[in-house]
Design a protein with these regions (language model features):
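Acidic, metal-coordinating helix/loop segments flanking the phosphotransfer/catalytic sites
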Residues: 6, 30-50, 54, 58-60
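Conserved active-site segment of CheY-like receiver
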Residues: 10, 86-91, 111-112
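Two-component/phosphorelay signaling modules centered on CheY-like receiver
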Residues: 11-35
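Conserved phosphotransfer cores of two-component systems
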Residues: 43-46, 73-81, 101-102
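Two-component signal transduction core modules
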Residues: 51, 83, 106-108
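Alpha4 helix (beta4-alpha4-beta5 surface) of REC/receiver domains from two-component response regulators
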Residues: 65, 69, 89-108
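CheY-like receiver
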Residues: 115, 119-155
Length: 155
């Protein structure tokens, strides 16, 4: 299944590697370097299946921006979008926080990066997001249909 994927990674080499890997799999990929670029893309994009976020982003003002902050925004406003965290700075505590507080779908360390495991994680995340979106669409249709039937009975 092909998905719409956003990659937020400040290191150009990693951004390009991940983007190329996923485009070869047939996914529609947008790769950006900053939280602001990610927010801008999400504001204009519908049905985002997956966001792949670096935990630590060094913004142009040289402050460490936390990818967890963006993950929290995604979880709050885009419940069907899955999030995979990727980091070169992750500890077990960071990983647990990503899963417990923000319901990350998966977590990868750059030092131990396995492209096959990563592709599998992406595939599962995209599939799950699509299934959830389909279920929401079907539920919306059923609610609409029931309301129309109720209106007819009232007439």
């Amino acid at each position: 299944m092909r998905g719409k994927i956003l990659i937020v990674e400040d290191y150009a080499d990693w951004r390009e590697l991940l983007s190329d890997l996923l485009q070869r799999e047939g996914h529609h990929v947008k790769a950006v370097a900053s939280l602001q670029d990610a927010r801008n893309y999400m504001a204009e994009t519908k049905d985002l299946d997956l966001a792949i976020l670096d935990i630590r982003l060094v913004e142009t003002d040289k402050t460490n921006e936390d990818g967890m902050r963006l993950m929290a925004e995604i979880r709050q406003h885009r419940s069907s979008t899955r999030v995979i965290m990727i980091t070169g700075h992750g500890t077990m505590q960071t990983q647990r926080r990503a899963f417990r507080e923000f319901q990350a779908f998966d977590f990868f360390r750059k030092e131990q990066f396995d492209s096959e495991e990563f592709r599998q994680g992406v595939h599962e995340a995209v599939e799950q997001a699509a299934q959830e979106r389909k279920a929401h669409t079907e539920n919306d249709y059923m609610r609409s249909h029931r309301y129309e039937m109720w209106q007819r009975k009232q007439s």
